[in-house]
């Protein structure tokens, strides 16, 4: 199944989809400092370097053999983040969500996934979020929106993220977010679980000698 990756960064989200069996023939990233990292991580993916606002279907289509099954991406979070500008859709970076939707409408894939920071669900952004949901609906997608925490899904990290997941309406898919495997506190994976095996090999900093 072919996936288009937008706002790809170094390709972390892409890696998850590749491990799930998807192919990502083409991706886009704006930041030149990340290009080489992405290419090393995903040598089989063609990276379109540059501003997503300037990219059209004609730029992407030549790298796809067959139909596009899905579009994934993490539009910039700074304008939504509690540690960022808090301007949401009023910030130019927040408006890049519109370009994600524009490309979605051009390809009409079976599904999409868009991820962002938990601050997007702050009350101050409610009108903007409802507008985004309406745009997805107008584009022909049934959308599910929720916030999940990585610690509930087997990760030793407190990391809350908002996910928009949509399926084309003609497919009549009723998506439900899966229950986390470690939602129960007794099953949580901690940093201790991850690095405990290093106790016999790590050298205490006080015992290290300069080279």
Residue positions per predicted region:
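Conserved SAM/SAH-binding beta-strand->alpha-helix loop
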Residues: 31-32
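Extreme N-terminal starter segment of soluble prokaryotic enzymes
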Residues: 1-3
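A short, Lys/Arg-enriched amphipathic alpha-helix followed by its capping loop at the start of a domain
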Residues: 16-23, 41
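Class I S-adenosyl-L-methionine
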Residues: 58-67, 77-211
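S-adenosyl-L-methionine
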Residues: 36-65
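The conserved SAM/SAH-binding core of class I Rossmann-like methyltransferase domains
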Residues: 27-28
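Class I SAM-dependent methyltransferase "Motif I" SAM/SAH-binding loop
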Residues: 6-10
């Amino acid at each position: 199944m072919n996936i288009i990756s937008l706002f790809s960064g170094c390709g972390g989200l892409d890696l998850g989809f590749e491990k799930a069996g998807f192919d990502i023939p083409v991706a886009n990233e704006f930041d030149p400092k990340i290009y080489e990292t992405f290419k090393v991580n995903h040598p089989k993916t063609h990276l379109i370097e540059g501003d997503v606002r300037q990219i059209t279907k004609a730029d992407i289509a030549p790298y796809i053999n067959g139909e596009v099954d899905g579009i994934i991406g993490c539009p910039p979070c700074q304008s939504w983040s509690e540690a960022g500008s808090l301007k949401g859709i009023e910030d130019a970076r927040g408006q890049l969500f519109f370009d994600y939707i524009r490309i979605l409408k051009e390809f009409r894939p079976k599904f999409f996934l868009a991820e962002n920071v938990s601050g997007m669900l702050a009350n101050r952004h409610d009108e903007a979020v409802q507008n985004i949901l309406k745009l997805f609906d107008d584009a022909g997608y049934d959308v599910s929106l929720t916030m999940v925490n990585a610690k509930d899904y087997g990760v030793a990290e407190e990391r809350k993220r908002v996910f928009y997941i949509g399926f084309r309406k003609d497919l009549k898919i009723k998506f439900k977010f899966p229950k986390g495997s470690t939602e129960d506190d007794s099953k949580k994976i901690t940093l201790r679980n991850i690095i405990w095996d290093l106790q016999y090999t790590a050298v205490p900093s006080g015992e290290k000698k300069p080279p």
